[in-house]
């Protein structure tokens, strides 16, 4: 039995579909758990890249199902995610599918991947005001896929998890306890990116991975994190995705007096959100 046929008939291992939903982009990958953990994805596509290639470990799988070959992006992130997922399911009709979602904020409650149920979803929705550009789109995709098939398993992996175990002195603000009890603290983000970098270092440069490191995540959103022995020690991000270095549309670190000044000048909350 050739490799392409095995992919369509092996029902003992699920296909894992991952979604990385940002404020204006979406990346999807599909992995066959029957392969090695570090094997290439079966399918991968960022938004507007319609050249999805199905891959074996090192070679492009040329017998690409037509359901993926003729895929085109949709008008919204959610519709695009649903369209991509539908095509993957059509390509592997006999396989169980598990969805894993990058979720930016897990708050103080979630620091390991969790299965998304009603309780988990409710808590993640509560965190949306802290990450208004990223949390709602990701949760919208989860809701849309759940609407397609109630039996699908959805797992959330959190950007904040990498920074969760930092010492309290690095994560606390000098604010009233009542605010700290509400979850006002330094969280740190881009954690999944930092975890991926650390895994590569541990594989290819294990001696370097154990040292004190400064790692930068540079894109539309940017952050810098100090790592020691593979663990986050400090990060330029704080309570939200606004702090730290200047970014594509965010000013980065601001003296809190600037916010007070803007309020005194009559800026509305909506105007400040748009500006910052």
Residue ranges and their predicted role:
Residues 88-135, 153-155, 161-173:
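Short beta-strand-loop/turn "lid" adjacent to the catalytic site in phosphate-handling enzymes
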Residues 36-94, 115, 120-134:
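N-terminal phosphate-binding loop and adjacent alpha-helix
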Residues 31-38, 112-122, 169-178, 229-234:
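A glycine- and small-aliphatic-rich helix-loop capping segment at beta-alpha/alpha-beta transitions
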Residues 212-216, 270-276:
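Beta-strand segments within the central parallel beta-sheet cores of soluble alpha/beta enzyme folds
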Residues 23, 75-79, 115, 119, ...:
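Conserved active-site and cofactor/substrate-binding residues in soluble primary-metabolism enzymes
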Residues 10-59, 211-233:
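Gly/Thr-rich phosphate-binding beta-strand-loop-beta motif of the actin/hexokinase/Hsp70
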Residues 101, 132-197:
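Gly/Ser/Thr-rich active-site cleft segment
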Residues 165-264:
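Glycine-rich phosphate-binding loop of actin/hexokinase-like ATP-binding domains
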